[in-house]
Every structure is written in structure tokens, then in C-alpha cells.
């Protein structure tokens, strides 16, 4: 079995399971779209244990930096500036912070940080997101995105392992023939 075929089976089945879990038993507590972003990020970071670590740490760092950026942007500190200018300055500083954080090897995946940052801001801007970025609950978009992305990264890791097993089963069957 080719790698693409094994991945198609693994990701297809696990993607359906993840969607069912997120929309069913987990009752919409987490964001399936953020989980799929992290799942893709896992592969973007090269997979395996190192890709899992880079994805979880990078997306979490990006989410935290986004939360800080959102808090500062809405704190009224830049009230003398036009709102769009103040928000732009805050986002610029947040992005610069992410890139500088990438100097620390554990947080070197700038794309993972950007995915976490963007997902957190997107969730915070959704009209149905009532939470504050300082709450320690699932109403906080930072918390929701970090948890969703951890689950997504784990699904990525499992999908890679399952694809490897499917390829191995195919090779063992060919060896017996």
C-alpha cells in the first residue's frame, strides 16, 4: 500500500471520528476547525514526536500571544490613536514577539505560532464567543484553541502511526505470499 493510500484511509477515518467527537459527545466545547489546523501543522512540522512537540508548543505559544495582544488592544491604552491604528500596532508587536520567541528552539516553528495566533483571534472575533481572554474556562478563546489544537495534534500523531501500521500490514501480507 502506498503512503498516500495509507494516509487517506487513516486521515479519512480519524477525521470522521474527530468530527463526530467534537460535534457530538464533546458538544461543541472545542473547535473542530482549530483541531484540523493543528493536524495539518503536525505534518507541516515533519510529523513524529518532534512534530507533535513543535505543533503543541508552537500553537499554544501563538494562542497565548494572541490573547495578550487582544487584551492589550482592547485595554484602552491607545485611546488617543484611531482604533484601527492601535490594533495594527498591537498585532505588529504580537507578531514580532512570536518571531523573537522562535529563537528558543522549543518554539522555533513560526508557522505553528501563526496558526495558534490566527485561530485564537478568529475565535475571539466570532459573535458567539462571549468569553474573555483572561477567564480560566472554555469561554476563553485562548483556552479553547489550545485544547482544540492539542487534540488535533494528537490526532495527527495517531493518524501517522495508523498509516505506518497499514503500510506495514501490506508489506507483511506481501512477504507471506
Please give the residue ranges for each predicted region.
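Cytoplasmic-side transmembrane-helix entry/capping segments in multi-pass membrane proteins
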Residues: 52-61, 84-87, 107-116
Amino acid at each position: 500500500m502506498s503512503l498516500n493510500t495509507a494516509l487517506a484511509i487513516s486521515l479519512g477515518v480519524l477525521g470522521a471520528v474527530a468530527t463526530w467527537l467534537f460535534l457530538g459527545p464533546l458538544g461543541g466545547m472545542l473547535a473542530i476547525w482549530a483541531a484540523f489546523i493543528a493536524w495539518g501543522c503536525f505534518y507541516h512540522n515533519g510529523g513524529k514526536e518532534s512534530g507533535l512537540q513543535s505543533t503543541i508548543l508552537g500553537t499554544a505559544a501563538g494562542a497565548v500571544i494572541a490573547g495578550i495582544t487582544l487584551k492589550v488592544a482592547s485595554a484602552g491604552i491607545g485611546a488617543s490613536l484611531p482604533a484601527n491604528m492601535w490594533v495594527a500596532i498591537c498585532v505588529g508587536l504580537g507578531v514580532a514577539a512570536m518571531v523573537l520567541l522562535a529563537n528558543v528552539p522549543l518554539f522555533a516553528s513560526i508557522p505553528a505560532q501563526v496558526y495558534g495566533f490566527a485561530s485564537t483571534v478568529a475565535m475571539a472575533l466570532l459573535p458567539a464567543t462571549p468569553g474573555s481572554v483572561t477567564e480560566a474556562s472554555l469561554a476563553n478563546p485562548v483556552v479553547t484553541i489550545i485544547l482544540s489544537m492539542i487534540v488535533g495534534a494528537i490526532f495527527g500523531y495517531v493518524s501517522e502511526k495508523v498509516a505506518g501500521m497499514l503500510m506495514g500490514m501490506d508489506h507483511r501480507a506481501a512477504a507471506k505470499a
